[in-house]
Amino acid sequence: MQFTFVDRVLELEPGVKVTTVKCLSMGEEYLADHFPRFPVMPGVLMLQAMTDASALLVAATESFTHSMITLKEARNVRFAGFVQPGRVLTVTAEILKLEDRDVELKARGTVDGRPAVNGRLVLERYNLADTRPILADTDAYLRQHFKSKLALLYRPPEEIAADAPRQSV
């Protein structure tokens, strides 16, 4: 089973911030068990939604240079609300610091404008071929996958404006 925690990218400013949404549906299988009479998105999956949004930001910031962008640390994570079916978790992540292999970000998730989760994340980025050159083709595939995923989830404002019908005077 594969989970998706970014349904759409609302805003993307490479090197600065990203805003994404996750629309929680009763179709999410884990809701049957978490919790049976009070279905809510598990906290660890809210953290994963922040991680996924942050990884898209890092990938776009560096023009998809790295095939692997993984969570290294989650600091000061606070859960402040529930995400129930029919609600939308809006995640915003901002880059605080870019270092050699690590990127530090501040991330938060809200539901209807109210805080649900926030924390600081450290993501580590690298290529598999850095340690195993034979995996260079896998790196290329994964980088292309990131690009394709972002192309499906985000349309820059200038593209949307170009598609808008022109009004004649």
Residue spans of the language-model regions?
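Hydrophobic core residues within well-ordered beta-strands of beta-rich domains
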Residues: 3-5, 89, 103
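Conserved positions in beta-strands of structured domains
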Residues: 7-10, 75, 80, 94-96
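A residue-level signal for conserved active-site and pocket-lining positions in enzyme catalytic cores
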Residues: 9, 50, 113
